[in-house]
């Protein structure tokens, strides 16, 4: 049963990984075809706002009723989102498809964390996390180039449709294993569906406010978003999360900050290389390959070094590497240095997030209260998704504002990179509050290098 479950989960994460890298690669082509560069950031943000709501609901359902239902519904919605985005006649419809896809991805990821916690013993978890981390290797190596080739040869819509058969295969493998896993022996309470919707709605209002050119409307949206989203976010995350207090709260918060910094830069890399340096989609997309491969390498380095390092050292080092890489990418945009430097710089950032993301992932699971593994994993994914949504959304707002004021797209991209670098510095500061009294024991629970979904899905 465990072998079937492992294969099914790995294939599912592989689908999310390929989709994430493919969308980042082909989005400049989609924007050229449909217009709507002002919605560039929303293509990513909508995905993660949808995931925000579903990951909370699915985590609670997994704790109460088992992982089969949230996984099955999540995979179905993920496939539906692919269909909507692939058939979209306009950029707003692409955004809508990505929203549906994100709802599905959130449910899948919450189910995955709960399945690992319940389907494997503590001694087996190092192995399963390491195996799942490899689900990003093949998409990272071939995904961007394959997506660019398919888009140029058959059209960008085919990239979305090509993922669908593999979703059916993943369901055929994972569903029987999840059915055998059954419901948990000691169900937890789960999180409020109302809070899940409020967090996503508040996040959407905040992002809409940041990108609205009308000052009065922008302020109204920001105030409403904060009033709706912040109290709900406090209720669905561990105590002390928003304040970054030590222990579980700080660990969950740095998860959001690390995705803010990393994906707030990565989402605009292909666009930057195309607009500023004139690279073809295939070459521009390859920068994502360097980041993806180095991400996985960083997670394996973490596994080797973690017994000799403290959690504080691991995670602060990760933020430092991400900041260094982002500064290198910014230098490629602002100076005439060779564009190949962007590939090297992004490899540094990829190694950084692999090193730190793995530590945060399993640290949160280890600190989760009994009977709350699904909800705690969901809380981590909430901050993961919120960080990515705001990293890409704020960057997208910078691009939209620049274009709206008649400035070059490159000006908005530069602002997006600077914002992401600031996020990395803040993350480094919060990570210094983590326990530094003893060597990290995170390695005892294994590693995980897969983004949230995304990574970006």
Say what each PLM segment does:
Residues 1-2, 183-185, 432-457:
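Intrinsic disorder in cytosolic terminal tails and internal cytosolic loops
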Residues 2-25, 38-46, 53-57, 68-69, ...:
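12-transmembrane solute porter fold
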Residues 8, 74, 79-81, 97, ...:
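Small-residue hotspots
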Residues 25, 48, 52, 58-189, ...:
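Helix-loop-helix hairpins in multi-pass membrane proteins, especially solute transporters
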Residues 28-31, 116-121, 126, 130, ...:
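Helix-terminus/helix-capping segments at the ends of transmembrane helices and short amphipathic helices
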Residues 32-33, 63-64, 86-89, 118-121, ...:
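Membrane-helix boundary and inter-helical linker elements of multi-pass secondary transporters
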Residues 71-73, 125-137, 186-196, 240-253, ...:
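Cytoplasmic-side transmembrane-helix entry/capping segments in multi-pass membrane proteins
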Residues 152-255, 261:
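Hydrophobic transmembrane-helix bundles of small-molecule transporters
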């Amino acid at each position: 049963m465990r072998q079937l479950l492992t294969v099914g989960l790995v294939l599912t994460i592989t689908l999310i990984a390929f989709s994430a890298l493919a969308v980042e690669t082909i989005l400049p082509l989609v924007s050229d075809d449909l217009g709507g560069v002002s919605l560039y950031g929303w293509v990513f943000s909508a995905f993660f706002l949808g995931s925000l709501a579903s990951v909370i609901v699915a985590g609670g359902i997994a704790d109460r009723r088992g992982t089969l239902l949230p996984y099955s519904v999540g995979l179905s919605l993920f496939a539906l989102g692919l269909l909507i985005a692939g058939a979209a006649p306009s950029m707003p419809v692409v955004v809508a498809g990505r929203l549906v896809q994100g709802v599905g991805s959130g449910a899948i990821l919450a189910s995955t964390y709960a399945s690992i916690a319940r389907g494997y013993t503590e001694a087996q978890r190092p192995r399963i996390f390491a195996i799942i981390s490899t689900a990003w290797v093949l998409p990272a190596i071939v995904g961007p180039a394959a997506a660019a080739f398919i888009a140029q040869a058959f059209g960008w819509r085919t990239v979305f449709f090509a993922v669908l058969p593999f979703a059916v295969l993943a369901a055929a493998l994972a569903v029987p294993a999840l059915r055998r896993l059954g419901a948990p022996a000691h169900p937890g309470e789960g999180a409020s569906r109302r809070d899940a919707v409020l967090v996503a709605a508040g996040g959407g209002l905040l992002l809409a406010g940041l990108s609205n050119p009308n000052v009065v409307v922008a302020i109204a949206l920001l105030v409403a978003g904060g009033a709706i989203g912040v109290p709900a976010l406090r209720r669905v995350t561990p105590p002390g999360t928003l304040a970054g207090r030590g222990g579980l709260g700080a660990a969950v918060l740095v998860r959001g900050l690390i995705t803010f910094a990393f994906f707030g830069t990565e989402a605009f890399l292909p666009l930057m290389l195309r607009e500023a340096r004139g690279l073809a989609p295939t070459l521009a997309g390859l920068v994502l390959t360097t980041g993806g491969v180095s991400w996985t390498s960083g997670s394996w380095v973490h596994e080797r070094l973690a017994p000799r390092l403290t959690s504080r050292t691991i995670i602060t080092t990760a933020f430092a590497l991400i900041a260094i890489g982002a500064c290198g990418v910014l230098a490629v945009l602002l100076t005439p240095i060779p564009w190949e430097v962007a590939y090297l710089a992004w490899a540094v950032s990829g190694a950084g997030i692999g090193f730190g993301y793995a530590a945060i992932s399993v640290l949160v699971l280890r600190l989760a209260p009994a009977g709350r593994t699904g909800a705690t994993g969901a809380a981590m994914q909430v901050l993961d998704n919120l960080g990515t949504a705001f990293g890409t959304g704020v960057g997208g707002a910078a691009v939209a504002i620049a274009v709206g004021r008649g400035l070059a797209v490159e000006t908005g991209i530069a602002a997006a990179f600077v914002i992401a670098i600031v996020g990395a510095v803040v993350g480094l500061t919060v990570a210094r509050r983590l326990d530094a009294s003893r060597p990290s024991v995170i390695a005892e629970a294994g590693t995980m290098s897969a983004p949230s979904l995304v990574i970006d899905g």
